[in-house]
Amino acid sequence: MSGSYSPQKDPQHPTQHQQFPPTPPYPSSSVWSGNLGENPVFIGIGSAAGASALTLLGVMGYRRYWKRIKNADYVTSELLRRRAWIKGIVTSVGDGDNLRLYHTPGPFFRYPFKIRSIPTTQKGLRNETISIRIAGVDAPENAHFGNPAQPHAKESLEWLRATILGKRMRCQLLAKDQYNRIVAVPYISRRLWWDRPLPLMMLKEGMAVVYKAGGAEYGPWGLDEMLKVEAEARDAKRGLWALRKFESPGDFKARMKLKSDVSEERPEKKSPSGWIALVKRLIRRT
């Protein structure tokens, strides 16, 4: 027989002499989990995720708890919707039922962490305070817009100034009125005891009456409780209830408005001029 027989190699059926590249071993899950802490890629991803989470939490915390509200324009609908609480210092009292509050969020306005201060000049406070309308009460009207002051307006204003000016207060934000004031329930802060609710204090001392106009807010007590406190002051003749003739602030404002409307509608009497005026002067002399 000429030549030797050599079988053809079938790639689909390798013989024992054929060898393929070895398959790389796959690590088990235990190996992966055991090496994650040493893998620089996973360390980098974890560090970046942690830093991002801390940054996000910091921004959210700052916006919710430490960002200062400069004035009523910065009070958002979201703050009013959730009836947020703020704290601050009363910088001025312009009427018997409103105040201006300098918002002091966070721990940095009080010792031992005090690193921020409150302006003391009118220039420094301009556009930096929140105009607060005390919810649920109505104090006697001061003189303004050409109208006279209502009886007991001075006493109510002086009492409110002596009670809260320069004091630290907590306020629950409720709404914004047509004058861009924030309707809120203010409490006088006390470190060692319960905070004092200012609206109830005003009613109890006879410095205001319950506000009953449309859209009124009565805080956590409700209208019935506030009317009860008002009735107790009336029976004891405290404050404005000691007046011999009392007119509610609402009735007073309505009367002043009616008076103003009538005066605007009344035509002005024109002084006579020319020969008519001359004749009248001659008649008066005779």
UniProtKB/Swiss-Prot annotation:
E.C. no: 3.1.-.-
A GO CC annotation given for this chain: membrane
PROSITE patterns registered for this protein in UniProt: TNASE_3
Residues where Ca(2+) binds: D138
Cross-referenced InterPro entries: SNase_OB-fold_sf, Staphylococal_nuclease_OB-fold
PANTHER family attached to this UniProt entry: EBNA2 BINDING PROTEIN P100, SERINE_THREONINE-PROTEIN KINASE 31
Name the record gives this protein: Probable endonuclease LCL3
Organism: Cryptococcus gattii serotype B (strain WM276 / ATCC MYA-4071) (Filobasidiella gattii)
Higher taxonomy: Eukaryota, Fungi, Dikarya, Basidiomycota, Agaricomycotina
